[in-house]
Amino acid sequence: MEAALLLAKLPEAYSIFDPLVDVLPLIPLFFLLLAFVWQAAVGFK
């Protein structure tokens, strides 16, 4: 029961990280975009 209460409090405890959690799923898209821009810069060799 204590573990359930602890898990219930975690989102409140880590609420300051909410903006970071919102951005994290976008990071792979940034890598994909970076790879495309890099290939465009070297002429798609």
From Swiss-Prot:
Claim: Transmembrane is one of the keywords in the record: yes
Propeptide residue span(s): 1-8
Membrane-spanning parts: 24-44
A GO-annotated cellular component: photosystem II reaction center
Mode of membrane association: Single-pass membrane protein
Keyword flag Nucleotidyltransferase: no
Any Gene Ontology biological process: photosynthesis
Taxonomy, superkingdom: Bacteria
Cellular localization per UniProt: Cellular thylakoid membrane
UniProt keyword annotations, A-Z: Membrane, Photosynthesis, Photosystem II, Reaction center, Thylakoid, Transmembrane, Transmembrane helix
UniProt cross-references to InterPro entries, sorted A to Z: PSII_PsbK, PSII_PsbK_sf
Protein task: One of the components of the core complex of photosystem II (PSII). PSII is a light-driven water:plastoquinone oxidoreductase that uses light energy to abstract electrons from H(2)O, generating O(2) and a proton gradient subsequently used for ATP formation. It consists of a core antenna complex that captures photons, and an electron transfer chain that converts photonic excitation into a charge separation.
Assembly mode: PSII is composed of 1 copy each of membrane proteins PsbA, PsbB, PsbC, PsbD, PsbE, PsbF, PsbH, PsbI, PsbJ, PsbK, PsbL, PsbM, PsbT, PsbX, PsbY, PsbZ, Psb30/Ycf12, peripheral proteins PsbO, CyanoQ (PsbQ), PsbU, PsbV and a large number of cofactors. It forms dimeric complexes.
Family the entry assigns: Belongs to the PsbK family.
Protein name: Photosystem II reaction center protein K
Organism: Picosynechococcus sp. (strain ATCC 27264 / PCC 7002 / PR-6) (Agmenellum quadruplicatum)
Gene responsible for this protein: psbK
